Amino acid sequence: MEFEGIIIEQLDTKTGTNPTTGMEWKRVSYVAQTEERSPQTVVFDVWDGRDGRIQRLHLQTGMKYRLFLNFEAKKNKEGKWFNVISAWSAREVSIIDENKNGEEQ
């Protein structure tokens, strides 16, 4: 799914080790918001394993991005369901000045 919005906050960074593979991982959470009349907000994670995704995406607070998100439902040990929203790609969106016939600033 695509979501276009501004990163309004970077949340916590968590690290750990996969008990099965022994591979270290890192996760950074972000909050993004659309610029609509009634803004929509989403919290999502960027996971970093061997691919260096966190550094590659280099998301910055205050910048506008087109985010490519995966949604997955999981069940915890108590049997309750929850959603996991992860970004697998992001592209910075150019700012358009509509007063200049749609030319980029």
PLM regions and their residue ranges:
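Single-stranded nucleic acid-binding surfaces, predominantly the OB-fold ssDNA-binding core
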Residues: 1-105
